[in-house]
Amino acid sequence: MGLQDRTPTTVEEYASYKTRFSNWGRWGEDDQLGTLNHITDDQIKYAAGLINEGLSVSCANPIATEQVVGNQQRNPRPADHRMMVGADSSGDYVGVAFHGYVNTHIDALCHIFTGDSSMGGRLYNDRDPNLVTDAGALTNSVDYWKDGIVTRGVLYDIPAMRSQEYVSPDEPIEGWHLEDWAESVGIQPRPGDAVLVRSGCDAFWRANENFEFSHPPATPGNGPSVIEYLYDNDASLLGWDLQEAGYKHFDYPARIPIHEVVIPYMGLPLLDNANFDELSLTCKSTGRYEFMLVISPLVIRGGTGSPVNPIALF
C-alpha cells in the first residue's frame, strides 16, 4: 500500500511513517536544519546554472489585511497594517499572525510537536517542547535559517496534468501523481529539491466562494503518500498553495496529517499558502519546470516561522 503500489495510505501505514521517515539524529544531535541539509554546494551551483532567461517570479500572496467577505474563517485574524504619514515622509507598522491558510509563510521546525507536550510530545530531533517559551523558541527556530534557502525548485503542476482548473476535492494529490508529473516533463528528482505542488488555489476559491471553511478545511490538496515521495527523493522542503486534502480515504489519527509527520519527525520545512499561478504560466512559456528558488525568512529570534516572498529565477 502507499506510494509503492499506488494506493492510498492506510491508517496503519500512516502510523508507521513516524518511525520510517524520522530523521532524528541523522545529522547529529545539534542539528537545526533538518532536510535543508540536503541542499549541498553542488545543488546550489546547479540551481544557479538554471538562470538563463533573466526572469524572476514571485510565489507569494499579498499580506491579507482583511477578512474574506462571506467566509471570515479563512482569515480570522487579518494583518494589522497602519500608515504613519508625515509632512515630508511616510512609514508604516505591520503586525501579522502568519500561520493559517492565507498568508505565504514558512514553518520552522518548532511549529508542530509530535503530540501534546503534557503527554510526551517532542520537537524535531527529540527535543524538549518546554524549550518553546512565551519569549520565543530556544531551539528549532526560524532564525537558524537566516542565511536563506537557495536550491532548485521544481513545480508539480497537477491541474495542468489533469487538464483541470484546480484539483478536485475528492481526488487528493498522491505521491505517485508527483512521480507521473516529473516523468511527463522530464524532471529527474535531485537531493535538496524544493518540491512545489500546485493545486489551483485561486481557481478553486473563485469557483467555490461559498465553500464552508473549517479548521482544518475540507479543500482540495495533498494526501499522506506525498510524504513518501519527499523522503524517498531527499527533498529539502515542500511548498503548496493548498495544504492537506480535506477528503481522506481513511480516518487518520491526525488533524493535519502531513504537517504532523514532516515537521517534527522528518524535519522538513513547509512553505504554506504559496501562489504558483504566475509560476505555472512562466514554466509553460519557457518549457521547463525547474528553476532556482530563493526563500529569505525574516530573522525572528525564537520564531516559529516567517512570512516570506519566495522568488523563482529562470
Language model features: what each stretch is:
Residues 1-314:
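Active-/binding-site microenvironments in catalytic and ligand-binding cores
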